[in-house]
Amino acid sequence: MTYFDPKIQESDFALSSYDYTLPFSAIAQNPANPRERAKLLIYQRDSGRIIHSDFYHFCDFVPKDTLLVFNDTRVIKARIYAHKLDCNTQKLSDKTFEIFYHKPLQSTSSAIPLFLVQIKGRVKCGDKLLINTDSTNPFLIAQVQECLDNGLRVVSFMQNEHALEYIQVLDMLEKYGHTPLPPYIKREDSCQDAHFYQSVFSKQLGSIAAPTASLHFSKESIESIKAQFETCFLTLHIGAGTFMNVESADIRHHLIHKEFFSLSPQSAAAIQNAHKVLCIGTTSARCVEYYARYKILQGECDIFLYPSKSFKRVDYLLTNFHLPKSTLMMLVSAMVGREKCLELYKLALEKGYRFYSYGDGMLIL
């Protein structure tokens, strides 16, 4: 069952058609604890039936002979804080600069590893930002190599005048970084976020946001799923593009972000041979659909799914409730139709469901 609403209208391509009003009180600021306490809205497309439940009963609704596909990416502690170092006086500024790590850059012209970051605060090329100001360890410095638009900067990370390699940068972020909570969570990160803003099966470090549909499962519930259904894992590293606004009034003109993905030959075979495929989250769905079209096991996924773009391999989807006018909401609309998506979101609000990353989920069958 890979169909979408066949009654495509011109309004389905209008960005404004994906807007809805969401009160701040409906945006989850903290995770459900235990994870399975999160609510679950089940929408059965064949019958039009809607059921309200929770993740304790998730397996009860998944059809037999279904393959469940999970994204095992792991979230980097991508947010770090630093102080500008005056090169003449060697004094530190009082102002704190936020550095938000994005990804490593491939460069043939640079002799040192370079990284893309976003810096809050005015900096220029050559500026040095000291990260571990209260440490007796050798100083860790981010040096600005190039200034790009939208606060983006190309930097190198240095320790004792030696440039850090990618693995060393990940180690540094793990030690000094903070959990990169999305901007709509209006609080500082805490110790609980290091645990709850990470799926229990995450392995491959590389995302700067969590695949949020995966956050609803404890180790016990994953074991229960594996005992009842076939499962497989893939990796798609979620980048900063997931938070980018769609600027085109006609969504067909939007250029979606690229994200690194990888799946094993075993997972690819399982997906290809499965009777039915249930993707846990939109990232898994995008990866599966990319593979279904191009049969590539590793690369950069830039598939954009919206009404009129049919699913070729994904039959069912588990997903959270997404931001208005977001590409994720458009992906859901590709599966159920835009008007039905808005109708389900309206119902979820009326029933007290929590939205966004730490919010509740919807199972589309």
Curated annotation (Swiss-Prot):
GO BP: any one term: tRNA wobble guanine modification
Biological source species: Helicobacter hepaticus (strain ATCC 51449 / 3B1)
Keywords: Cytoplasm, Queuosine biosynthesis, S-adenosyl-L-methionine, Transferase
Enzymatic reactions: 7-aminomethyl-7-carbaguanosine(34) in tRNA + S-adenosyl-L-methionine = epoxyqueuosine(34) in tRNA + adenine + L-methionine + 2 H(+)
Family named by the database record: Belongs to the QueA family.
Protein name, per record: S-adenosylmethionine:tRNA ribosyltransferase-isomerase
NCBIfam families: PRK00147.1, queA
Location in the cell: Cytoplasm
